Amino acid sequence: IAISFPMMFSSKSNIKAWAEVLIGFALLFMGLEELKNSVPNLKENTEFLSFLSSYANMGILSTLIFIGVGTILTLVVQSSSAAMALTLVMCYEGYIPFELAAAMVLGENIGTTITANLAALVGNVHAKRAARAHFIFNIFGVIWMIFAFQFFINSIDNYMISNMDLSPVSSVGESVAVPIGLSIFHTTFNILNVLFLVWFVPLISRTVIRMQPSKGEIDEEFHLEHIGAGLMQTTELSVLEAQKEV
């Protein structure tokens, strides 16, 4: 931040843009560090440990349960990025094993589509269709991943053992084994999901058009309901209009 901040006052737009990028990354990692430090020591919480022991060894049912946990977590924090960061921190601290964390990541991919659909409620028909397509895209990705879940977990574990001498499944090596494995899982899942479902884009498009038909020209254009054109003389009324619009 100290290096990037003076660059913000540069007259060149490229330098200012790079300064914003560097400051953004710095704030991101500072936030992750604060999040890691603020997470309580859950290992001393017997109720939490008993919950994990009760639901960690139930096979496919454990996967489904923690997919639901990831979905709910994303809805609560209203951000899949924040939910993913919290999951990574919990993995780093050793609170949850790799398999359950990966299942939570799948749930977070579902949760982020729900928040997008909620945000699209005030949008036009195109925004609503995009939100529906996002939901269909991610939900089908999670469905096919459930069937290949254990294969992916074992493949990532074998890859990391061969190339990094780390094992996220058995937590052999440093404490970063599980977060690294989780990052590989998340990235691989999204790439493969795109490669698989890109061929079904026309079908998804037709489906969301049927799900969200247009109601005419009014529905095609987004417009504010409470805020009119121009600024009002009283700032209190302007704030009130903005609150109603939100």
Feature locations, PLM:
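Hydrophobic core segments of alpha-helical transmembrane domains in multi-pass membrane transport
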Residues: A2-S10, G24-L35, I67-T74, F140-F151, ...
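Non-transmembrane accessory domains of multi-pass membrane transporters/channels
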Residues: I191, V198-V246
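Membrane-interfacial helix-loop connectors
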Residues: I1, T74-G111, A120-V122, Q150, ...
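Helix-loop-helix hairpins and the membrane-proximal interhelical loops
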Residues: L22-I72, M90
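Membrane-interfacial loop-to-helix junctions in multi-pass transporters
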Residues: S50-G68, Y95-L100, S170-I180
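Transmembrane helix-bundle signature of multi-pass membrane transporters/permeases
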Residues: I1, I23-M30, T71-L75, V89-E93, ...
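Structural signal for the N-terminal portions of transmembrane helices
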Residues: L22, A127-F140, S167-P202, M211
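Membrane-water interface regions at transmembrane-helix termini and the short interhelical loops
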Residues: I3-A17, A120-H126
